[in-house]
Amino acid sequence: MAIWGLGTDIVEVARIEQSLARGNSLVKRVLTPKEQEEMTASVDEAAFLAKRFAAKEACSKAFGRGISAGLSFQHMQVVHNEYGKPEWHFTETAAQWVKEQGISGSHLSISDEKHYAVATVILETD
């Protein structure tokens, strides 16, 4: 295995709270419909959104292309396996791009404290 890409992002939860106070445009841009449902059910919506935003930004950095050229935050969704480990679910469009790049695996770590959320993504190839 070799590292194909690495990305890290940190988000200040207060900035997400301010954005939520102005409306839900960030929610619609960042979260998939399933993630929006999860956010509504969460104890702290701002922290939930901050963690997802950090994760998706970190993934876009690991991709080495940011969010552009046909890929958006809507093409990636954070899911959890049976042990609670965060993992990626990519739409068909994103999954095809990942396959074309020769990316064979991904690792996602998300952490948060009262004021910050941080995520790191490692993409690997055989």
Curated annotation (Swiss-Prot):
Keyword Magnesium in annotation: yes
InterPro entries per UniProt: 4-PPantetheinyl_Trfase_dom (IPR008278), 4-PPantetheinyl_Trfase_dom_sf (IPR037143), ACPS (IPR002582), Ppantetheine-prot_Trfase_dom (IPR004568)
GO-annotated cellular components: cytoplasm
Source species, domain of life: Bacteria
EC identifiers of the protein: 2.7.8.7
Keywords associated with the record: Cytoplasm, Fatty acid biosynthesis, Fatty acid metabolism, Lipid biosynthesis, Lipid metabolism, Magnesium, Metal-binding, Transferase
GO molecular function: holo-[acyl-carrier-protein] synthase activity; magnesium ion binding
Cofactor: Mg(2+)
Chain positions recorded as Mg(2+) binding sites: D9, E57
Known catalytic reactions: apo-[ACP] + CoA = holo-[ACP] + adenosine 3',5'-bisphosphate + H(+)
UniProt key word Metal-binding: yes
Record's subcellular location: Cytoplasm
GO biological process: fatty acid biosynthetic process
Function: Transfers the 4'-phosphopantetheine moiety from coenzyme A to a Ser of acyl-carrier-protein.
Protein family (similarity comment): Belongs to the P-Pant transferase superfamily. AcpS family.
Protein known as: Holo-[acyl-carrier-protein] synthase
Encoding gene, per UniProt annotation: acpS
